[in-house]
């Protein structure tokens, strides 16, 4: 081995030791989901109130709930899309078992005409802090 190869090997070893181990593959990836809902237009205001309470509580008390964005179509406000990001699958499962989520499901049961859940993989996510 020549001096150049030894220097490269030494630098690589130093960088590896300073950076620490690479993230383990066995760690769970974030759980990302999109929910598409159709709400009974006559109950839209009540639905939004229940959803607001659920989202605000989940963000405040569940460390594994990272993002919950609820939007409606401009020309059809009864069509709701929720973009959800959880720390991992366990955080998503814990969210489903939380008291506030169960309350939301019970409260909105007769308001939701259809629900479609779409599992997603994050490709590019960007945001600015407010």
Named regions from a protein language model:
Residues 31-61:
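N-terminal targeting signals for Sec/Tat export/insertion, comprising classic cleavable signal peptides
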Residues 45-47, 78-80, 127:
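Short acidic, gly/pro-rich beta-turn/loop elements at beta-sheet edges
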Residues 1-3:
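N-terminal secretory signal peptides that target proteins for export/translocation
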Residues 5-10, 14-31, 69-76, 105-130:
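Glycine-rich beta-strand-turn "strand-cap" elements at beta-sheet edges
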Residues 30-38, 67-96:
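Short, well-ordered beta-strand segments in beta-rich or mixed alpha/beta enzyme
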């Amino acid at each position: 081995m020549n001096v150049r190869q030894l220097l490269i090997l030494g630098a690589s070893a130093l960088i590896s030791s300073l950076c620490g181990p690479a993230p383990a593959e066995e760690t769970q990836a974030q759980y990302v989901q999109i929910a598409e809902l159709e709400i009974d237009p006559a109950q839209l205001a009540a639905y939004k109130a229940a959803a607001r309470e659920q989202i605000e509580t989940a963000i405040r008390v569940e460390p594994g709930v990272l993002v919950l964005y609820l939007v409606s179509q401009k020309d059809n406000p009864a069509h709701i899309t929720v973009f959800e990001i959880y720390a991992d699958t366990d955080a998503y499962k814990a969210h489903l078992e939380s008291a506030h989520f169960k309350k939301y499901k019970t409260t909105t049961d007769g308001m939701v005409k259809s629900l479609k859940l779409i599992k997603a993989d994050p490709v590019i996510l960007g945001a600015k802090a407010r």
